[in-house]
Swiss-Prot record:
Residues holding Zn(2+): 406, 409, 424, 429
Cofactor: Mg(2+); Mn(2+)
Protein name: DNA ligase
Gene field: ligA
Source organism per UniProt: Lactobacillus gasseri (strain ATCC 33323 / DSM 20243 / BCRC 14619 / CIP 102991 / JCM 1131 / KCTC 3163 / NCIMB 11718 / NCTC 13722 / AM63)
Gene Ontology BP annotations: DNA repair; DNA replication
Record field: catalytic activity: NAD(+) + (deoxyribonucleotide)n-3'-hydroxyl + 5'-phospho-(deoxyribonucleotide)m = (deoxyribonucleotide)n+m + AMP + beta-nicotinamide D-nucleotide
Record GO cellular component, one term: cytosol
Length: 668
């Protein structure tokens, strides 16, 4: 860090505090971080160093003197009898050595550590009275958290009653397993809802719900690792973990009691290599002085315990070269850029594409075709370009020019007011029509089985379908002209199209793909007004009278139905026999089939369906779709360019099916 004058340091401290406060609110209060942990940590450490150099600049409201984030939600507030402190963190093995040397100096002799995985989730406190769960709360700002007792009752691994009548408090981490996260995001994507950026956000958003029924559906898990007031016979951290496990708490059994830093470093190296194979997310390793009496002797600072430290994993990065920038048109006309890169192995998978989101983001990153870029996975899940390696930029490189024509129909692209996205506003744009029909047929909407992207594209190319109403006039003769579409597939598709006419009207409303009208909004509107034709005549005030339906949704829906083309489409659908009434929804158990109760993994590029559609198709059949191959996997289904998962399946002798073989099994 450059040497600063006092005035320069004061200005820099103010800038860092403002930035960190904004980021902390996004992270803690909104469960929607806008920067990577590594970016936040770097800024935080810079502030810590400046406050060390200029102690007079330290203030009580500095983020370095606080725990977590301020509480801004509608959940009831809970005061913690014993503050829930943050944890100090380091980013290198040298810093860990310094921590160990500091502890040794303070207590006068070497100590043993209980070394545990740092779970990437949301801190949680559980209080019991006479063995009964009486209160669950989040950390909040360390002094005051949020009451999530009602929600905790729906987390399966939290014991509601202990085997002994203890009055006590334990603490741990609430998290979402990678498989549950993938399933939740696939469902939200299918319904047109915003997906979560990573499992930590998903867990936090799911636990901090006002409606406990939502928490129940989210399949959360916990690891308990702290006993606030253990019985006197519990004298060590590893003993506390074992006893909490005996009492029925879900504890992480990977922790080890280690007596040397060489052993600690070996543990770190082992789990740095293993982290992508775990079913849950970890972002580091935690060292805790194992002896509880020494923990009490060492005590706490204002913000963190002196007896524990977290070693944070560095974000895994790889360098690759941008070969091209593709622009794709979504069903609402938003045109999104994607960087297409040389394939690289990153965090357990082969990555060759990363979203560039919108023109502003692309300009900010400064990415050009031919650039070498650093690539990481946001939340260990989503590929993201960290930066451009400028010293490797080709000499003949030129700034990338944002297109002004739609890549599908060639019409001018526009920026709508208050939007960063580029849009094509041509309602007959082939890409929008195609995406709109795919959405209409999706599981969350009309659930027309067998109508995947490949089939939709052929129907449009052959001019058999120009809008969703045309689906209800398809004939056996037309479908027989499609490539690789056999008699049974034709019969199944026509049957599914016919069956969709009986769907409840909220599925049809959602299927129309009206901007901002997701599955939940469609259901709420039809629950109140019962009939879709009536909904098409509603005013903005009538729509906003429904709880949670705001002006954005109401204005978008009324603007859509004010178009003569929308009224014409609705009339055509009614004339084709589609139900316009709200019927509610009924979930049915999957019938017996090849994939029922089987554990399945998908890998490679699929040609007939998107990954999300195929996942839902298998789940509808009662299959469990997971993200990693193990001895428990029943089948691996693979498409083109299958990578390490296929290799692992071969090694474990897991049965494998091509995409077409799997489809044949589904259609039997």
């Amino acid at each position: 860090m450059a040497v600063l004058t006092h005035n320069q340091a004061s200005q820099k401290v103010d800038e860092l505090r403002k930035k960190l406060d904004e980021w902390a609110e996004d992270y803690y209060a909104k469960d929607a971080p806008v920067v990577e942990d590594a970016v936040y940590d770097k800024a935080y450490q810079e502030l810590v160093e400046l406050e060390k150099q200029f102690p007079d600049l330290v203030t009580s409201d500095s983020i370095t003197q606080r725990v977590g984030g301020e509480i801004k939600s509608d959940l009831s507030k809970v005061e913690h009898p014993v503050p829930m402190l943050s944890m100090g963190d380091v980013f290198s093995k040298d810093e860990l050595k310094e921590f160990d040397e500091r502890i040794t100096k303070l207590v006068g002799h070497p100590v043993a550590y209980n070394v545990e995985l740092k779970i990437d989730g949301l801190s949680l406190s559980l209080e019991y009275t006479a063995g009964k769960l009486t209160r669950a709360s989040t950390r909040g700002n360390g002094r005051v958290g949020e009451d999530v007792t009602a929600n905790a009752k729906f987390i399966k691994d939290i014991p509601q009653t202990l085997p002994e009548p203890l009055t006590t408090e334990v603490r741990g981490e609430c998290y979402m397993e990678k498989e549950a996260f993938a399933k939740l995001n696939a469902e939200r994507d299918e319904k047109g809802e915003q997906v979560f950026a990573n499992p930590r956000n998903a867990a936090a958003g799911s636990l901090r719900q006002l409606d406990a029924r939502i928490t129940k559906k989210r399949n959360l898990s916990t690891f308990i690792y702290t006993w606030v007031n253990p019985p006197k016979n519990i004298t060590s951290q590893h003993q506390a973990i074992d006893e909490m496990n005996r009492l029925g708490f879900h504890t992480n059994q990977t922790g080890q009691r280690l007596e040397s830093m060489d052993e600690v470093f070996k543990f770190i190296d082992e789990y740095t290599a293993k982290r992508n194979d775990l079913s849950y997310g970890i972002d580091g390793i935690v060292l805790k002085v194992d002896d509880l009496s020494l923990q009490n002797e060492l005590g706490n600072t204002v913000k963190v315990p002196r007896w524990e430290i977290a070693y944070k994993f560095p974000p895994e990065e790889q360098e690759t070269v941008v070969k091209e920038i593709e622009w794709t048109v979504g069903r609402t006309g938003v045109v999104t850029p994607t960087a297409v890169m040389d394939p690289v192995q990153l965090a357990g998978t082969v990555v060759s594409r990363a979203s560039l989101h919108n023109p502003d983001y692309l300009r900010e990153k400064g990415v050009r075709i031919g650039d070498t870029v650093k690539l990481h996975k946001a939340g260990d899940i989503i590929p993201e370009i960290s930066s451009v390696v400028l010293n490797k930029r080709p000499k003949d490189s030129e700034p990338y020019q944002i297109p002004n024509k739609c890549p599908s129909c060639g019409q001018d692209l526009v920026h709508l007011q208050d939007e960063v996205a580029l849009r094509c506003i041509n309602p007959m744009c082939p890409a929008q029509v195609e995406e709109g029909i795919i959405h209409f047929a999706s599981r969350g909407a009309m659930n027309i089985m067998g109508l995947g992207p490949r089939i939709v594209k052929q129907l449009i190319d052959k001019n058999f379908v120009n809008d969703v109403a045309d689906l209800y006039h398809l004939t056996n003769e037309q479908l027989s002209q499609l490539d690789h579409f056999k008699d049974k597939s034709i019969t199944n598709l026509l049957t599914s199209i016919e069956n969709s006419k009986q769907n409840s009207a909220e599925l049809l409303l959602f299927g129309l793909g009206i901007d901002h009208v997701g599955a939940k909004a469609a259901r709420l509107i039809l629950e109140k007004y019962k009939n879709l034709e009536k909904v098409s005549q509603l005013t903005v005030p009538e729509l906003t009278s429904i709880d949670t339906i705001g002006e954005t949704i109401a204005e978008s829906l009324t603007a859509y139905f004010n178009q003569p083309s929308a009224q014409k489409l609705l009339q055509e659908l009614r004339d084709s026999g589609l139900n316009m009434e709200y019927l509610g929804t009924v979930e049915e158990e999957a019938p017996d089939n090849f994939f029922k109760e089987k554990t399945v993994v998908l890998t490679g590029k699929l040609s007939d369906f998107t990954r999300s559609e195929f996942t839902k198709k298998l789940q509808d059949l009662g299959a469990k779709v997971t993200g990693s191959v193990s001895k428990k996997t029943d089948y691996l289904i693979y498409g083109a360019d299958a990578g390490s998962k296929k290799d692992k399946a071969e090694k474990l002798q897991v049965p494998m099916l091509t995409e077409q073989e799997a489809i044949a099994k589904i259609e039997k």
